Amino acid sequence: MSARLSIEVCYASAGEQALIAVELPEGATLRQALDASGILRRFPQIDLDTQKVGVFGKLKPLDAVLNDHDRVEIYRPLLVDPKVSRQRRVEKTRKAGSIEGRRWQNKDSR
């Protein structure tokens, strides 16, 4: 009997999360796991041409071979650049007058 892989496929949209367990033959690829899970039918908004995929937080190509107990993840596009988001949080903290927000300013402007 050939070895089987236990794989989880997960995706989180803004309002719903899905974690789907599938069993695949040894040597299966990330693309095969996505197809077997049916997640692309459940979430038609997923576009694999633009959205990134990975295993346990590490980006992988669709033809990457999976290992037993891997978790395949489909990543949504970022709504805001992380650098811009952090800058906004610091500005908000500065406006509130917190010492924490002022520590990023030059010592002369404190």
Curated annotation (Swiss-Prot):
Disulfide bonds: none annotated. Residues 100-110 have a biased composition (Basic and acidic residues). Pfam families: Ub-RnfH (PF03658). SUPFAM superfamilies: MoaD/ThiS. Residues 86-110 are annotated as: Disordered. NCBIfam families: PRK01777.1 (NF002490). Belongs to the UPF0125 (RnfH) family. PANTHER family: UPF0125 PROTEIN RATB (PTHR37483:SF1). This is Protein RnfH. The gene is rnfH.
